[in-house]
Amino acid sequence: MLGFDIDGRRAPPSLKNRIVLSLSSDDDLTADAMQTLFDTGSQQDAAEFGAALAAPAVTGRYDELRGGAAALSSASLAPAWRAFFTQLGSVGFADLDRRADALQRRMRENGLAYHPHERAAGGGAVRPWSLDLLPLIIAPDDWAAIERGVLQRVRLSNAILADLYGEQTILRRGLLPPALVTGHPGYLRPMCGAQAPGGTWLHVAAFDLARGPDGAWRLMAQHTQGPAGLGYLLENRLIVSRLFPRAFRGLHVQRLAASYRALLQSMQALSPARKNSRIVLLTPGSHAATYFEHAYLARYLGLTLVEGGDLTARDQRVYLKTLRGLEPVHGILRRVDDEWLDPLELRPDSLLGVPGLMQAVRAGNVLLANLPGSGFLESPGILGFLPRLAQALLDETLTLPAVHSWWCGEQAACDEALPLLARGIVKPTFPASVQAGGAGGGGGGARHAGGQPGAARREPEAARARRAG
């Protein structure tokens, strides 16, 4: 999703997401003089022409172009979109086909793709990355509300993790059913008693948001382990901004670079060696679905891209294997989910992690972003309990609401949800391995009233592919 991005010093970790540099002579696609059937006569006419061309949203949906519910919105464009089409001008309309071709060409040249699970399993398929020509424009007031809500939810997640791996007052007070926490495989007992550097469990998080017919944003899902998107966001922004340079300048779209600097600086500040820290990016490998962005993000941030076999843990410290010998590692930005991080304490069949990594993390000798143990927060069953947790832990009301959801492991919630079944989406509370009788416990499903399921970023297929290869 492209839109107005916030300054990096205030950037919510979830929305600092998605670049590859590709400079060519036509990158800026300035408005060349040309004969066109779309000669609207003036810049203002271009905005009216855009409004006439754009089909209205489906009834019951929010009309982004016109800024209102489909049945209630006027025929005119929302101010931000009017400004965009005005900057585009009449020649810009005539040039849209060429810009669309340029977008596809740049994605191919930059290798921008998503590798679906079947490729990792040996199918060889590569899914082209999907990117719309026109960006989603989020007005400053809307973005400020999203920013406040996301930052608040990150603070809440940090407070929940600190409590559940510490004093566990949440469970003692009955604010969360134990089955949703200790029964979930994402709750890692090896992290009990661990201290998060600076109180920060989550350095990066991702939130799936949707806008309702009333224009309000709602949370659909949250991703807390090693969420994907930071590299794709940058690539999307670079490509689209070069296709519409005048519009991006005219709308004063906020920059992204400061957000990435802030992420790196915060990791340096919290890692053992501070500014002299060596930070690496841990990837499952080239079979991972989002390996493209792992490689790009490491290059953009100036980090060494490593796999589990490139690291070793000795004496509660982590080292990088080099031709010059072992070199200390002080920070790890990971793109490997929790269960695969350490075969000694987590999944014994993992080939993606580092034996002894968990011990080094608990000893405080290496910063792991994000800290392991937040997987249970990704369960859709927990969403309905977050408002009262915010009141209990932060003494605040959540400003960014989630879709209405019920955890059907409680009889009262199940009775309330069943009559609404035809209008909602049923999601599993626990991963498939637990549903099939694997490790973990508890049961029940989570039901959402409306929306689309948000798929958590999982990459165990890389381990299967590596074992097969």
Where are these regions (language model features)?
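Preference for protein termini
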Residues: L2-D7, L15-G469
